[in-house]
Amino acid sequence: MIIRILIITAGLSFVADASLAQNLSAEQVSDQNLDFFLIQAFNSKDARSRLALNHIGIQGQKQEAGFLVTSVLEGYPAHRAGLNRGDIITSIDGQPFDPVTGFNRAAAFAPELTSRLLSVLRNTDLFEVSVTPVYENLYDSFRSANSASLQQFSAGNKIIGYLHLWGLSRSSHDLILIQLLMQELAQCDGIILDLRDSYGFLDPEHLQVLLTNFSNINVTDASGWLTSINNTASSIDSNPYRRPLAILINERTRGGPEILAYETSKLERIVSLGSATPGRIGSYEQAGDSGAFNYRPADSTRIDGQHFEGIGLQPESVLEWPLSEIRRDDPQFEAAVTLLLGII
């Protein structure tokens, strides 16, 4: 059994060369790194221990030209300012941009809710946008973005629903909220469930909103991402969505969302689309006294008797969308709409 160890730090100090975990060791996430705050917040046992920081609701990675945006949370400052996947943020107020130190200039974080000027490169166009960060932990931000993503739209004579589950948690409140979000889409002819760039845990109760026989997930030697930490979730009423559903995944879908996509895509009415997930279903523990997490792969965990760590899920319909391909539309989303219209 792999055990998740909570890390609680205060008064962290940061350097200018911060980036996401993709640019550091694959097995360690430093506190100089935006991903550190995502892991810390989701692994904390209560709201008081989650570290808040000033941020604008982006994920990304450091490149020579600047910070490459890989995703933008709905309803957050970057989204409201019109920033898109594939944009490169080159500077903040004329200084090199860093997603952590750029908005958190003091070692002990405190709200800095003032407007900042970003220089952004989109293809060959360089432009500026003003953003005012929010001061919030990333657990709350990802959960809020879940709700903000909800939409319905007409496609031909059909109604398609859309929901991006940015973060999955195991609290009863969040399990019920996901069920309520799905209920708002209950009358749709089909739903696009977006799990791209998503993170979090998985309980069998997450499957209740999609599967009638949700308890049949076959996991051996389950690590902390699956083991339930609450006693009330099992009493949540099951009223699963029974119509066609397209699930979007990519190489940045990590942890519980990977298994959610894997388990639900077994049904003929549910189709996965996008690019392969990384198979990152292990756990994190504090790296000694340092401000970092070490990643422990779930090498002994088996899903339906098969090794999943480092392998991940290959979507039924593969459609790569490289970050280097900058476009105004979302080809994976558009393909999901076309796919649903062909089966509903």
Predicted regions and their residues:
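Sec-dependent signal peptide recognition
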Residues: M1-I8
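C-terminal, low-ordered peptide segments at domain boundaries
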Residues: P96-C188, G312-W321, I326
